[in-house]
UniProtKB/Swiss-Prot annotation:
Entry protein name: Cytidylate kinase
Gene that specifies this protein: cmk
EC number: 2.7.4.25
Superkingdom as given in the UniProt entry: Bacteria
Source organism: Syntrophobacter fumaroxidans (strain DSM 10017 / MPOB)
Compartmental location: Cytoplasm
Amino acid sequence: MNNATIIAIDGPAGAGKSTVSRLLAKELGYTYLDSGAMYRALAWALQREGVDLEAEAHVARALPELPLEFSTRGGSLLIHCGGKALEDELRNPEMAAYASRISQMRAVRTFLTEWQRKLAEAGKVVAEGRDTATVVFPHAGVKVFLTADPAARAGRRHAEYLAKGIRVDYAVLERQIRERDEADSTRCLAPLRPADGAVILDTSDLDISEVMSRLMDLIREKSRG
């Protein structure tokens, strides 16, 4: 795997990782690898099979038998479970909560880390998540840690849900984000932190065009060596 073909973007929930990664992949002609969608898909598949998400041993036993497939085409990540394409069902607060729960399980992280690395072998990728640069692709050619204050992140997530027709209370979202930050940064397994050599970018007061401009400058600088 050529390290120069991987751009790894980490950061807390709502920092803009998904939006920025999707735009970067399109701009560069890379594949967008959405690890959050992969965790939500796994949670959805486990629920579909009636697996108790609180029982790590049950989850670990179920993983090899799940009819879950990840692939890439035309720069996009495709997710199927039992022949069904998973898209909108993964984008709701409930599934995000389930994904957060199983993401703390070692067997789950190992399972999806292997999938992410396998997908990256097929070509150039922009990969995003919470341990993408620290664990999944520690030797990525470009490593970025996107962050923003919790209020700004809650506002962005609230707007995303409203755009999808999902009504969610802003205060609840902000509380969930703060709780998720605490859980992610203090967990024993792959805690949320900037990777060695990562560029830290606070997006609290930046719009998407400003973030993209800074990241493209960084990528050009890295490509020049």
